[in-house]
Amino acid sequence: MGNHQEQDYSASFRQAYDQAEDEGYFFENVRDIFAADDMTIVNLEGPLTTSEQMREGQTYCIKGDPAYAHLLTLGSIEAVSFANNHRLDYGEQGSRDTVVALEQEGIIYAYDKNVGI
């Protein structure tokens, strides 16, 4: 749910988000399946942050807007893991912003030794 720093707006997630008539569009084909299970856990590939401080030496820094956390709720996603190679693309600030966005939506998260329940 985001873009890398050099990606054009054209054909980007941001463009799809801006043009979507319904925010539920992104998970519409799996929402019913996710809603019927006990818990849906997904990988959150990049942080949800407005930070512009990219990690040095990283070829592709991925991030999404913190508002995208709401899309997870609309998709009946209850938990995310973001213990992956892009978690620190925007430093610790990016991780903190992600945690805040997830907590505001009531989404459980896990990364490294941190679990938000």
Please name every model-derived segment.
Residues 1-117:
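Acidic, metal/ion-coordinating pockets
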